[in-house]
């Protein structure tokens, strides 16, 4: 896992590397918007991105109903990133469960096509981190970082936002014959 700690009201861009800060600025200049309270239709559209991703990587995915309820149950946040009236990214964050100061970067998906000057994954990652700061600070857990000795693009991307690799684990499937 990769942890990054934020104070309340902190500018989280200070933790990001120069390239990601530039991509964030370019995305907003191009007209990207973050919708912190998305409509049901926007969440369903984002879920379509998630579903395609999880089908491709062969991982289980909860029902869309889980994400539709997340904001109203007050245990997490779902937000989307919109560009030209199209949902291009989004995230589901679990917030301070129990007495914990941890925020979990639970699910994220972005469009796979390239849009000139727009970096949906950078925007949704930044917004997830900003929510931690806006909600009083705490520790942002990027979650999965793969195995250290194996090349893993997702880990490389997450580390550009700062943070510290704290642990590694990987589930393994064993067949019992």
Positions of PLM-derived features:
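Active-site/acyl-donor-binding loops of N-acyltransferases
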Residues: 1-11, 135-177
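A conserved beta-strand-loop-helix scaffold within acyl/acetyltransferase catalytic domains
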Residues: 1-117, 147
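Polar/charged side chains located within well-ordered beta-strands of beta-rich proteins
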Residues: 91, 105, 125-128, 158
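Conserved acetyl-CoA-binding loop-helix of GNAT-fold acetyltransferases
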Residues: 115-130
């Amino acid at each position: 896992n990769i942890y990054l700690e934020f104070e309340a009201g902190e500018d989280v861009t200070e933790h990001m590397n120069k390239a990601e800060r530039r991509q964030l600025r370019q995305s907003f200049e191009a007209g990207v918007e973050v919708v912190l309270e998305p409509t049901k239709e926007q969440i369903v559209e984002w879920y379509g991105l998630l579903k395609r991703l999880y089908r491709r990587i062969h991982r289980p995915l909860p029902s869309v109903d889980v994400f539709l309820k997340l904001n109203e149950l007050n245990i997490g946040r779902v937000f989307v990133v919109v560009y030209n009236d199209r949902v291009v990214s989004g995230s589901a964050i679990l917030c301070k469960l129990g007495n914990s100061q941890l925020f979990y970067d639970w699910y994220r998906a972005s469009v796979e096509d390239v849009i000139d000057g727009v970096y949906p994954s950078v925007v949704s990652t930044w917004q997830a981190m900003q929510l931690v700061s806006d909600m009083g600070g705490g520790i942002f857990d990027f979650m999965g970082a793969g195995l250290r000795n194996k090349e893993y693009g997702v880990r490389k991307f997450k580390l550009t936002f700062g943070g510290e690799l704290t642990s590694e684990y990987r589930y393994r499937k064993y067949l019992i014959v």
